[in-house]
A protein has these predicted regions:
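Extracytoplasmic
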Residues: 14-46, 122, 126-127, 306-314
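Extracytoplasmic gate region of multi-pass secondary transporters
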Residues: 33-37, 158, 162-166, 239-262, ...
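Conserved MFS/SLC helix-loop-helix module at the cytosolic interface between two early adjacent transmembrane helices
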Residues: 64-106
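C-terminal ends and interior cores of transmembrane alpha-helices
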Residues: 87-102, 362-386
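Intracellular juxtamembrane helix-capping segments at the cytosolic ends
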Residues: 121-135, 405-420, 429
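Central cavity-lining transmembrane alpha-helices of secondary-active solute carriers
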Residues: 53-73, 330-343
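Cytosolic juxtamembrane N-terminal segment immediately preceding the first transmembrane helix
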Residues: 1-26, 42, 276, 280-281
Length: 504
């Protein structure tokens, strides 16, 4: 590896900055959307399963539209793919306005799906776009560098959600709201939905500015032919028609199954088109690629699952409030950001795959610490008005975020490294479809947490088996559930070791 090769050549610096802003944009949106689940539960007085449709819409859009995004980039260009992704992002965010006026969760569901669809197009095109603007020997470092802006956006998303959405929720419970007169209740709901809507509409201005910058940054692209346009339209129909039909014909269908069935549409398109079928065969014959898709599926799943249950774990083990638990999550995100910056620098001197193997071992050790180390308080930290206790197991839980930091972009870069250029864009879509792991791994972990008699619970000493009526879980099952992240990190470790001796 030539250490003197620039990560980003000067001629691509402007494009790289615009792409990095897109990374921050979808990171911001991801973490704002996570907070819509508790918000909608309170506003619409719905149960957790229906509020959880927010996540189904979000990850479903990623899985279903990733192949369409690849076709878009293949037939048009990366730049046009980014432009269309940003446009869809803006349209979805603007739909929050009629959703707020109509006070309709169904319109919000559609808006979230469209916004996430825009993010899916952005991720599918921006990641390989970053890989392509420079020397291949620095591609993994360049992608890690761009991905550093993603957790910056994530932190901003958490702050915006806390300050603009959650802080404006009325504290009245569902029972208290039921006793209110209609005018009072509608006034409260209208005010709450206004603050749900406001930050998303504000993001439209930022997305529009980025869109304008990309629009004026032309780079001698080919003209779009009628044939290419037709192929893109057909790919879009294959992506959305099966999903729409399933949604209206089988409204009671398990939403995870709904998404999995919806993915069959775009997959069928790829199988039916001869040139895309050839690309698919290239990908199937490239172990570093399809193994990378599997590793990415488990990595995204473990990231979302671990962060989903971090707050609950802190509440149970330390007796802290949900607000304090959110601070532990923010500390983990800051560590995630710092470690990603550090790892990107170290990749100048060390093999990225070998570094990922070391980080995977560290993450597995953290899982063991979360499962077995005591929760006796070692020290406390004052953050504003909050006093946060830290125990050995909590330190491991927070440190896990640091070890996760380099995995997504490194898996992505290794999987696409050296891939036949003809299959690169379709290959990128497979790695984005792997984000569906977030909708599969998280429920798996939840099943263990909610089942005190699960066979997994035998992994944790029985003396920790205490029932918490408020959180509706046992300490044993909560600790035992972290065997799932350990398994996921083990998959990433196997992938890293398989390619650690090959030239990156």
């Amino acid at each position: 590896m030539n250490n003197d090769t620039p990560i980003v050549p000067k001629k691509f610096l402007t494009v790289f900055i615009l792409l990095a802003s897109c990374f921050a944009l979808w990171g911001l949106l991801n973490n704002m959307t996570d907070n819509l689940v508790p918000a909608f539960q309170r506003i619409f007085t719905m149960d957790q399963s229906k509020a959880g449709l927010v996540q189904v819409a979000f990850y479903g859009a990623y899985a279903v539209l990733a192949i369409f995004a690849a076709v878009l980039a293949e037939e048009f260009s990366y730049r046009k793919g980014v432009l269309i992704g940003l446009a869809i992002y803006i349209i979805g965010a603007l739909l929050y306005i009629p959703a707020c006026i109509a006070q309709s969760f169904d319109i919000y569901f559609i808006a979230i799906f469209i916004v996430a669809g825009g993010c899916s197009l952005l991720e599918t095109t921006c990641n390989p776009y970053v890989l392509s603007i420079g020397d291949e020997s620095t591609s993994v470092r360049r992608l890690n560098f761009a991905q550093m802006f993603n957790p910056v956006g994530s932190l901003m998303g958490i702050v915006l959600a806390q300050q603009l959405i959650l802080s404006h929720l009325n504290p009245a419970t569902a029972d208290e709201r039921a006793l209110m007169d209609e005018a009072t209740r509608q006034g409260i709901i209208h005010g709450e939905l206004f603050w749900v809507c406001a930050p998303y509409v504000g993001l439209c201005a930022i997305a529009a500015l980025i869109w304008i910058c990309f629009f004026v940054k032309r780079e001698g692209e080919r003209d779009v032919t009628r044939s290419a346009f037709s192929r893109v339209v057909v790919a879009l129909l294959f992506s959305i028609v099966p999903l729409t039909v399933l949604y209206f014909i089988f409204p009671e269908m398990n939403k995870v199954h709904w998404v999995l069935c919806g993915v069959l549409g775009p997959v069928a398109y790829v199988a039916l088109m001869k040139d895309y079928r050839e690309m698919l065969l290239i990908l199937a014959r490239t172990p570093r690629y399809w193994m990378g898709v599997i590793a990415q599926f488990f990595y995204v799943g473990v990231q979302i699952a671990a962060w989903t249950w971090l707050n609950v774990y802190c509440q149970k083990e330390l007796g802290v409030t949900p607000a304090d638990g959110a601070i532990y999550y923010m500390i983990g995100l800051v560590l995630f950001l710092v470690c990603r910056w550090t790892a990107t620098f170290l990749m100048k001197y060390f093999n990225p795959a070998l570094m990922m193997a070391v980080f995977s071992v560290g993450a597995i050790c953290c899982c063991a610490g979360v499962m077995y180390l005591p929760s006796d308080v070692l020290f406390t930290v004052e953050i504003g008005d909050h006093t946060l206790p830290f125990a050995a197991n909590i330190l491991c839980l927070v440190a896990m975020s640091g070890f996760m930091s380099l995995m997504f972009p490194t898996i992505y870069g290794i999987a696409l490294g050296g891939l036949d250029p003809k299959a690169l864009k379709l290959g990128a879509s497979g790695l984005i479809m792997a984000i569906l792991g977030g909708a599969i791994i998280t429920p798996w972990m939840a099943d263990i947490i909610g089942n005190a008699s699960s066979s997994w619970c035998c992994l944790v000493p029985g003396f920790l088996n205490t029932w918490d009526p408020d959180l509706k879980l046992t300490q044993t099952s909560l600790r035992a559930s972290f065997i799932v992240p350990a398994i996921c990190f083990a998959v990433v470790l196997v992938y890293a070791l398989a390619f650690s001796k090959r030239k990156q």
